[in-house]
């Protein structure tokens, strides 16, 4: 079920249907009508649900795009299109998640669904997928693992999106992934998995006590990182969590995470990191952070580092070919 509505015809973007880096998207612009060539979803669109639009793409391998008009879409989606696909949400400001008016929501726990992947509101298994200005939530809440989005593909890009849940919100399962100007909210292990991921200029928001990250890197040959760069780490509005949140814990034995150039609020426990997998020797780093939670003098399980890591280290030599640099 959904309740879409259009805000009105304002200045629109003229764009081609591409799933590769969307260089035409500029900060502080609106997107209130469909880019050229996109399938349309909403009360005035060709399709009433996002799932119907995905089905309409069929078995084509051409680049494609879908524009979703304002509304709440109660759907559970699998993104398995064979070509590059971009999903655009309506917004008055493409540079931020804060003005998003499109939400995809579903409520189920992993125990009820049968697996983490099956609990996901959106399950991405298509390489080269990009999403702009869409909120994704799993409304299950406390008591069980319940995924909002699982990224299980390579070269995934999320721009101005919001991911909300409680435990296991964002399952970065595999591949390389890029999150820019997004918000990720949860309480327990709400960024987890084995992907190599860059989070840039994001708000990472705890709505309960627990650990933020749970990397499942487990071999020294695994090149994966979680790089949290120029982000704000804070409590959800109205929630008091002073020293109740850890930067991470190792889901697998060689977890590797860095927080760099970020603002760590007073929610961060002075120990910084905590335990999970038996026998773990994680690689946990902090570099050039600020804020009440950035004092590292009492940190545990942490390794020193002399410089920030870069996108090439995290995403590989070709990162500039597939991320949207305008973000």
Swiss-Prot record:
Glycosylation sites: 84, 288
Signal peptide: 1-19
InterPro entries: Pectin_lyas_fold, Pectin_lyase_fold/virulence, Pectinesterase_Asp_AS, Pectinesterase_cat
Binding residue positions for substrate: 145, 249, 251
Organism: Aspergillus niger (strain ATCC MYA-4892 / CBS 513.88 / FGSC A1513)
One Gene Ontology cellular component annotation held by this UniProt entry: extracellular region
Family note: Belongs to the pectinesterase family.
UniProt main location, coarse: secreted
Catalytic site: 168, 189
Protein role: Involved in maceration and soft-rotting of plant tissue.
GO terms (BP aspect): cell wall modification; pectin catabolic process
Keyword terms, alphabetized: Aspartyl esterase, Cell wall biogenesis/degradation, Glycoprotein, Hydrolase, Secreted, Signal
UniProt-annotated site: Transition state stabilizer, residues: 167
Subcellular location: Secreted
Pathways per UniProt: Glycan metabolism; pectin degradation; 2-dehydro-3-deoxy-D-gluconate from pectin: step 1/5
Top-level taxon of the source organism: Eukaryota
Catalytic activity: [(1->4)-alpha-D-galacturonosyl methyl ester](n) + n H2O = [(1->4)-alpha-D-galacturonosyl](n) + n methanol + n H(+)
Protein name: Probable pectinesterase A
Enzyme Commission number(s): 3.1.1.11
MF term (GO), any: pectinesterase activity
């Amino acid at each position: 079920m959904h309740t879409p509505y259009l805000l009105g015809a304002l200045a629109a973007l003229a764009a081609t249907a591409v799933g590769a880096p969307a260089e035409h998207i500029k900060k502080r612009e609106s997107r209130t009508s469909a880019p050229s060539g996109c399938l349309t979803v909403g009360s005035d669109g060709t399709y009433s649900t996002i799932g119907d639009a995905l089905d309409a793409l069929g078995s084509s391998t051409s680049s494609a795009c879908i524009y979703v008009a304002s509304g709440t879409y109660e759907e559970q989606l699998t993104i398995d299109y064979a070509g590059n696909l971009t999903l655009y949400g309506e917004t008055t400001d493409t540079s931020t998640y804060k003005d998003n008016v499109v939400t995809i929501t579903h409520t189920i726990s992993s125990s009820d669904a049968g697996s983490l992947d099956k609990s996901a509101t959106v399950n991405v298994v298509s390489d080269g997928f990009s999403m702009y200005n869409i909120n994704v939530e799993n409304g299950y809440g406390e008591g069980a693992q319940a995924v909002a989005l699982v990224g299980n593909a390579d070269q995934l890009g999320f721009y101005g999106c919001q991911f909300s849940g409680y435990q296991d919100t964002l399952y970065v399962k595999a591949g390389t992934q890029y999150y820019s100007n997004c918000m990720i909210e949860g309480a327990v292990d709400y960024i987890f998995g084995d992907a190599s991921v860059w989070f840039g200029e994001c708000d990472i928001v705890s709505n309960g006590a627990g650990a933020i990250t749970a990397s499942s890197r487990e071999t020294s040959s695994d090149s994966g990182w979680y790089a949290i760069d120029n982000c704000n780490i804070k409590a959800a509005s109205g929630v008091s969590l002073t020293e109740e949140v850890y930067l991470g814990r190792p889901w697998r034995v060689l977890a590797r995470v860095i927080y760099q150039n970020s603002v760590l609020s007073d929610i961060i426990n002075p120990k910084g990191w905590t335990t999970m997998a038996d026998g773990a020797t994680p690689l946990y780093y902090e570099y050039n952070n600020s804020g009440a939670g950035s004092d590292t003098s009492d940190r545990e399980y942490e390794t020193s580092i002399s410089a920030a890591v870069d996108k090439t280290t995290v995403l590989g030599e070709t990162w500039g070919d597939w991320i949207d640099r305008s973000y």
